[in-house]
Structure formats: C-alpha cells, structure tokens
C-alpha cells in the first residue's frame, strides 16, 4: 500500500515595499540594453542581472548615497532583485513588482533566487521538468526558492528543502536566455 505526501509551501515573511511609485533619478539612470548586448556596469558585471538580498533588512533609497531619502526597507532575506544600473558602490534595483530604488552593493549577493509570480493559485513543484512529472509540492505565490538550473521552459529550484522543477513562466528572477541548452 503506497501513499503520497502533498506539501503546500507558503511565503513565510512579508516584504516591506512602498506602494508609491518612484521618481526616476535621471542623472544616474542608464538606459536598459537589449538582452543580446548586455552592458557592463562599474563593477564589471553585466547589466541588467539578477541578485538577491543578503540580510533580513535592507534599505532602499531614492538615489545612490546615504544622503538620499530612504524610500522603504525590504525585510526578506534572499528576495531576488534585478540590478539595472550601478554608480560607485550603489546598485539601482528593481523588484518583482516593478518598484525601483538604490541599494548599497554590500547588501546584495550574487546568489540566485527566484520568487513565484503572483497568481490565483499555487504552482506545482515537479520531480522532473515536465508537466506530467510527479508532484513534489504545491508552492504558493510569493514563495522564494534557490535557483539551481534551467532546462528549456523549466527551472530547477530548491524551496524549503524540497527540490524540484517549476515552469519558468511562473517564476521571476531568471532571464529567458539564461541556462540555454
């Protein structure tokens, strides 16, 4: 007699982000390049690129420096962000909701994470990269996972000690051209 265990993974901590839209800091904003011609930032790393938050709390400012007004504070370790510009040791970042601001580079990590996109339902974490693969867990929108690899339309993710595959279009934090076969 066999049985199946179905695990529902939910977001454990809210992230704080202002609902207000940011005014652009045009003096410091670089144009976003097409994915095929990714520019290099001041750090020598490609722009844009994905990173994650290193600590439990990370301030976001209106401009690249401590004298710029504080806009909000993220309170969610490993939240994926997209670096879209650099100025000295500051990074202009965009989150999965489209909010932008500047963060000190030391608050960010190159470790890759993804967040399940907002939708009306949980996403199935599969044992193999196929819609017919065995169910490992159901993952709620807003849950963060560690990105391990992608294969076609699927990405291998570790979520709360569960390993499996999520559809690439159901997560934010990876470009369509990354991990190409």
Where do the PLM segments sit?
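Bacterial N-terminal signal peptides
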Residues: 1-13
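SH3-family beta-barrel domains
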Residues: 19-62, 73-77, 84-87, 94-99, ...
């Amino acid at each position: 007699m066999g049985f199946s265990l179905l695990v529902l993974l939910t977001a454990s901590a809210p992230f704080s982000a202002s609902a207000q839209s940011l005014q652009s800091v045009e003096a410091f904003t670089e144009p976003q390049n097409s994915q095929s011609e990714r520019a290099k930032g001041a750090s020598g790393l490609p722009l844009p690129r994905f990173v994650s938050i290193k600590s439990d709390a990370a301030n976001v400012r209106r401009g690249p420096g401590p004298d710029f007004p504080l806009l909000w504070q993220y309170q969610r370790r490993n939240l994926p962000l997209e670096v879209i510009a650099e100025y000295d040791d500051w990074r202009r970042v965009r989150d999965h909701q489209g909010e932008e601001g500047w963060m000190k580079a030391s608050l960010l990590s190159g470790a890759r994470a993804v967040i399940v996109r907002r939708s009306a339902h949980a996403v199935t974490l599969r044992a193999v990269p196929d819609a017919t693969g065995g169910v490992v867990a159901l993952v709620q929108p807003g849950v963060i996972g560690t990105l391990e690899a992608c294969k076609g339309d699927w990405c291998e993710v570790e979520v709360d000690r569960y390993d499996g595959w999520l559809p690439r279009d159901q997560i934010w934090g990876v470009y369509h051209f990354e991990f190409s076969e």
